[in-house]
Amino acid sequence: MSISKDDILNAVAEMSVMDVVELITMMEEKFGVSAAAAVAVAAGPAEAAEEKTEFDVILKGIGGNKVAVIKAVRGATGLGLKEAKDLVESAPAALKEGVSKDDAEALKKALEEAGAEVEVK
């Protein structure tokens, strides 16, 4: 007769906490593993995911010099005059999405020099 996984799980569920800790210690010794190592490995990727690598550049407002902002948008995005004008007039609007931090900061600087209000997310 073979013991199923459900039978083992039910038996562990009926044990006290101290008995479960003792069982884990015995399993670690028998199989040469450590339960703490699995926790440390699982925590590693979460820290790496926190570092943001892609940014969105959002045009929040056009300021006083609309023509200069349109020119800056055209230069940065490669849009035609009408498309750039429509984009600028529809502010707040996303200009570029998923760009690197350096590209986002350069675009923000160029647009702010033209008089636009820009946000990098």
Swiss-Prot record:
SUPFAM superfamilies, per the entry: ClpS-like, Ribosomal protein L7/12, oligomerisation (N-terminal) domain
InterPro entries noted in UniProt: Ribosomal_bL12, Ribosomal_bL12_C, Ribosomal_bL12_C/ClpS-like, Ribosomal_bL12_oligo, Ribosomal_bL12_oligo_N_sf
Keyword flag Ribosomal protein: yes
Single GO MF annotation: structural constituent of ribosome
GO cellular component: cytosolic large ribosomal subunit
GO biological process, one term: translation
Keywords noted in UniProt: Ribonucleoprotein, Ribosomal protein
Assembly: Homodimer. Part of the ribosomal stalk of the 50S ribosomal subunit. Forms a multimeric L10(L12)X complex, where L10 forms an elongated spine to which 2 to 4 L12 dimers bind in a sequential fashion. Binds GTP-bound translation factors.
Similarity comment: family membership: Belongs to the bacterial ribosomal protein bL12 family.
Biological role stated in the UniProt entry: Forms part of the ribosomal stalk which helps the ribosome interact with GTP-bound translation factors. Is thus essential for accurate translation.
Name of the protein in question: Large ribosomal subunit protein bL12
Provenance organism: Proteus mirabilis (strain HI4320)
